[in-house]
Amino acid sequence: MIEYRKSVTVHGREIGLSTGVLAQLAGGSVLVQSGETAVLVTATMASKPREGIDFFPLLVDYEERLYAAGRIPGSFVRREGRPPEKAILAARLIDRPLRPLFPKGFINDVQIVATVLALDMNVPPDILAILGASTATMLAGIPFDGPVAATRVGLMGDDFIINPTYKEIEEGELDLVVAGTKNGIMMVEAGANCLPEEDIIDAIDYGYEAVQAMLTAQEEFIRDLKIEPMAFVAPANDPVLVSFVEEKASEAVAEVLRSFELSKDERDAKLDAIEAELGTTFAGLGEEDPLREKAAANASKLPALFKSTTKKLMRKQILVEGKRVDGRSLDEVRPISSAVRVIPRVHGCGLFTRGTTQVLSVVTLGTASDAQELDDLHPDDSKRYMHHYNFPGFSVGEVKPLRGVGRREVGHGALAERAIVPILPEHEQFPYVIRVVSEVLSSNGSTSMGSVCASTLALMDAGVPIREPVSGVAMGLIKEGDEVRILTDIQGIEDFLGDMDFKVAGTRDGITALQMDIKIQGITLQILEAAIQQSKAGRLHILEKMLIAIDKPRVELSPYAPRLLTLKIPVDMIGLVIGPGGKTIKRIVEETGAKVDIEDDGTVVVSSIDGAKALAAKQIIEGMTRTVEVDKVYLGTVTRIIPNLGAFVEVMPGKEGLVHISQLAEHRVRKVEDELNVGDEVVVKVKEIDQKGRINLTRRGIHPSEVEEARGQ
């Protein structure tokens, strides 16, 4: 294939697309480049469908190669291993706007791989990867209702920035990614510094406008190469079988969906029983029945048709009657309860229950050495706040092996982390490293937002001086033609059978995080705006209920949390405190039982569960790094005697000076040992500090009041 290139300019920055040179055996391959960031994206489709499944088998991988940033991996084998968290999040960012655009019923395996080949710190690669994934999919001829593209929107002062640099993202008030097609918005994800809803809506609109040029460029790119997608027609269901399912099940399903008093388990059990009875009825059909001609094939279609019937009836009930399966109105939140200190010894914990969704969050406070060092494309990257999310099988009543953290758990933890970070205190105010673990104990929708609420409770319980409490809510959507219903606080069945899962978190004053995924091919800005505005009332209601348990951070930390003391020492004295081979700092730790962490700028953090031990270590370090002043009087200890020369006296930890034999007393001294012995406490004055930093001391000319002052220090 001959190389083909095309470029598009988005808000003054050129983005280039090229194909035909790299990865020629992949179904579709495109190199996306902007500045000096280059991402190779490939899309490959299996030649045959994967039979026996009822989902689309799409796999998206995002590969960070550290050579892209001129680095060698820090692992023992010096090779990239399991994808880091940022790579997993980038893969999910690519997946979410693409997945709804593949046709229903399409079950060929598709794999999209985005490999970062070069990294320019002015151009984050994830946005380029989304553009490349869409283009590569179309180049491969895979059935796909694209193109789709994305852009990042930042906010500096009052100005929005399209595709900001890493520095602008870090210093700005907003990090928002919006993806869309020409039909509408497909995905939104954002972290914000408590911005008003109106600013978020304006940012989405601004970003969606910037996406249009990339959509046009892709269309021209594919048209110029004369790529035609593979013809695909979704297999049609036998209308006789559809009628059979609707006739036999609709009335019973509708009755269950209107039984508002049923719990989730009771409703699920009744629906399962109806589905089982449907199968029994089908199996009992006579041989002469036309549905029996392809009995095995038709029987395998029953579960999907039953789900379709349930979905249709639930959606109709919401659209026509405005009633949900639990009897709530469209904007009503489920019953809420909150509690803190539900388990002993931990540094802080919060239990948040909303309906049958329940999350326990636990806070652990640590020191600087507990910060997470990230071995990824970003050098010297570390985190002082970590949020980990666990979703065991028992939370949904299932048997599931516990085999590590999946992509979903990483994504939910990152979203909760993003929601909390803007309200954390500055490091100088609260120098702890903070880890929060959210344990999902029961799941019936919106566990990620439950994690945000439980974590806010836990942080306040731990005594972390957060700026404002944060709450979160998940919004849903039912859309049939022009009929639209927005749901507040969706539960599992509404998420499963609905069109949107839109999570919004924030304080009383504004939004800190949001994430929108849809199952349809785009929604308008007007629908999105309505969902954001409706979410505010839900968030504030939830926040009010949360604050019943605890309304502000505790003044005292848990007795089991470490006590931190900080001090600043001159950078040139770091080596003195550490000592040769770490000898000095080890001695301080052994003597006091405290932990000592020293940063490159001279910040020293001393920690211990026993505050007295931390104070003792701090005083030792202060003494070691205190500057000795000329003409000042000190109480010191004799450390060495040099016959006929004098005595060395330690006036501060690690700082010794010489008292010459002529300076030992007002009278003539013939022998040093006649005046002093090793271990004696003695009051001395600093006579001078020579050019080499050597301290000369004297015992002569010291006023009695100075002696008393020195002994009293």
Swiss-Prot record:
Subcellular localization: Cytoplasm
Required cofactor names: Mg(2+)
Reactions that this protein is recorded to catalyse: RNA(n+1) + phosphate = RNA(n) + a ribonucleoside 5'-diphosphate
Alphabetical keyword list: Cytoplasm, Magnesium, Metal-binding, Nucleotidyltransferase, RNA-binding, Transferase
GO BP annotations, alphabetical order: mRNA catabolic process; RNA catabolic process; RNA processing
Binding residues for Mg(2+): D495, D501
A single GO molecular function term of this UniProt record: 3'-5'-RNA exonuclease activity
Domain S1 motif residue range list: 631-700
Documented EC number(s): 2.7.7.8
UniProt domain KH: residue ranges: 562-621
GO cellular component, one term: cytosol
NCBIfam families linked to this entry: polynuc_phos, PRK11824.1
Family affiliation: Belongs to the polyribonucleotide nucleotidyltransferase family.
Function: Involved in mRNA degradation. Catalyzes the phosphorolysis of single-stranded polyribonucleotides processively in the 3'- to 5'-direction.
Protein name, per record: Polyribonucleotide nucleotidyltransferase
Organism: Gloeobacter violaceus (strain ATCC 29082 / PCC 7421)
